[in-house]
Amino acid sequence: MHPDDQLKSALRNGFDPKLLYKEPLKTVKEPICTILEKYSKIPLEKVVSHINEVRDRAFAVFPYACIGQFSFVELSIADSPCYAEMLDRTKHGQKLLDLGCAFGQELRQLIFDGAPPTNLYGSDIQQDFLNLGYELFLDRAILPESQLIAADVLDKQSALFSRLSGKINVVYISLFLHVFQYKKQVTVVQNILDLLPAEPGALIVCRVTACRDQGVLNATRERMPYYYHDLASWKRLWEEVESQTGLRLSVETWEQPDELVKNHPLPGIYILGSAIRRL
């Protein structure tokens, strides 16, 4: 099922999007506060109201948890143990894609830290989110619109693949894969691999919502049918991809501390970090 259709189905089945809507922010954490002040040139006293206004417009488009709960201002890419490598590779001419980038907030972190904007790409299925990213960061003069591509990762005929197949050295995926069921995830991952050059060192860095007890999820899948991995299923996913593609991949995993899941209503939810390298 397409992620948009999943959401519509959940709403029909009684899911209340208000559960995903936090009260307006009163304070803003780092690093987003500094980025909006120093990079976007928004006066410090206006940063909070600016974020709240953009959040409300975005939530009206699609009531995702990442929007309603202000996840888009909880920047996480710099917390990855691979961040220094990702940043360095972009500074030396390699291309990075943030897939499922939402507002492109992680791209702005990279730019703020010195990555050349022309070496960065973002893609999201919602053009509205890409536009809202410009409203949030006020940086159309810095990040060219040509670097942001509205596309469905399942559509191999989309601009994402016609423009970028074989040209991306690093793909970053954050809280994106779980919206697909397992079999669709296999297809998504295979499509992502087509974006990478056929050479050793091509890298995929993932931040994945995971669950220590898969049984906990069974009662919720009719209402919100996401697929949260555990370590065993994550390993199985990549083994299946290797088997189907003939590629050799190195898969590293770690548990990544994350504020987002501290108050998750389901027990055993955590953030699984992973780095997949082509051998």
From Swiss-Prot:
The keyword Transport appears for this protein: no
Keyword Cell membrane attributed: no
One GO BP annotation of this record: terpenoid biosynthetic process
Sequence positions that bind S-adenosyl-L-methionine: D124, I125, D152, V153
An annotated Gene Ontology molecular function: transferase activity
SUPFAM superfamilies tied to this protein: S-adenosyl-L-methionine-dependent methyltransferases
Membrane-spanning parts: none
Keywords: S-adenosyl-L-methionine, Transferase
Pathway: Secondary metabolite biosynthesis; terpenoid biosynthesis
E.C. numbers: 2.1.3.-
InterPro entries: Meroterpenoid_MTases (IPR051654), SAM-dependent_MTases_sf (IPR029063)
Phenotype seen when the gene is deleted: Impairs the synthesis of terretonin but accumulates 3,5-dimethylorsellinic acid (DMOA).
Gene3D superfamilies: Vaccinia Virus protein VP39
Protein family per UniProt: Belongs to the class I-like SAM-binding methyltransferase superfamily.
Job description of the protein: Methyltransferase; part of the gene cluster that mediates the biosynthesis of terretonin, a fungal meroterpenoid that acts as a mycotoxin. The first step of the pathway is the synthesis of 3,5-dimethylorsellinic acid (DMOA) by the polyketide synthase trt4. DMOA is then prenylated into farnesyl-DMOA by the polyprenyl transferase trt2. Methylation by the methyltransferase trt5 then leads to farnesyl-DMOA methyl ester which is further subject to epoxidation by the FAD-dependent monooxygenase trt8 to yield epoxyfarnesyl-DMOA methyl ester.
Complex and partners: Homodimer.
Descriptive protein name: Methyltransferase trt5
